[in-house]
C-alpha cells in the first residue's frame, strides 16, 4: 500500500498565473458600444457619472472593436444590421465577450417579424442575457459584474447563461 506518486498536478507557476490573468481581464473590461435602440440610452446613462463604471474597471467605452473585449448589443438587430454586427464581432480580439442587453437583443422583444433577428445569439455567442425593456442602468451594472465573475472564475467558456 504505497502512495501513488504519479498523480496529475497543475504546475505551481501555471495555476496562479492563470488566476492572475483572469483577474486582470475581469477588472479591465473595455466595452464596445453597439447601441441600436432605446436600450442604448440606458447604456449611455450607465456610463455617466451617477453610476461610476470606473470603480468596476469599465470606464472606457471604445468606438473601435479592435480595442475592446466586450460587446454590449443594446436593442433590436435588423436583418440589414446582422452582417455589420458579425463583422464587428469578428474584428474584436480574443478573448471577447457579448452581453445581449434588453428583450429585443435577447429574443426579438415585441418585434416578432421577418425584419428583426429573434435574438443575437443566432449571430454571435452570448455570455450574459439582460432582460428588460429597457433594462435600468443598475441591471446593466449587475450584468457586467456577472460577466466579471464568469471571467475571473473561468466560466467564460459556458456561453448563454441567463441573467434575469
Curated annotation (Swiss-Prot):
It comes from Protochlamydia amoebophila (strain UWE25). Belongs to the complex I 20 kDa subunit family. It is a peripheral membrane protein. It catalyses: a quinone + NADH + 5 H(+)(in) = a quinol + NAD(+) + 4 H(+)(out). [4Fe-4S] cluster binds at residues 38-39, 104, 133. Its EC number is 7.1.1.-. The keyword Membrane applies. GO terms for biological process: aerobic respiration; electron transport coupled proton transport. InterPro entries: NADH_UbQ_OxRdtase-like_20kDa, NADH_UQ_OxRdtase_20Kd_su. GO terms for molecular function: 4 iron, 4 sulfur cluster binding; iron ion binding; NADH dehydrogenase (ubiquinone) activity; NADH:ubiquinone reductase (non-electrogenic) activity; quinone binding. Its cofactor is [4Fe-4S] cluster. GO terms for cellular component: plasma membrane; respiratory chain complex I. NDH-1 is composed of 14 different subunits. Subunits NuoB, C, D, E, F, and G constitute the peripheral sector of the complex. Pfam families: Oxidored_q6 (PF01058). It is found in: Cell inner membrane. Binds 1 [4Fe-4S] cluster. This is NADH-quinone oxidoreductase subunit B. Keywords: 4Fe-4S, Cell inner membrane, Cell membrane, Iron, Iron-sulfur, Membrane, Metal-binding, NAD, Quinone, Translocase, Transport, Ubiquinone. NDH-1 shuttles electrons from NADH, via FMN and iron-sulfur (Fe-S) centers, to quinones in the respiratory chain. The immediate electron acceptor for the enzyme in this species is believed to be ubiquinone. Couples the redox reaction to proton translocation (for every two electrons transferred, four hydrogen ions are translocated across the cytoplasmic membrane), and thus conserves the redox energy in a proton gradient.
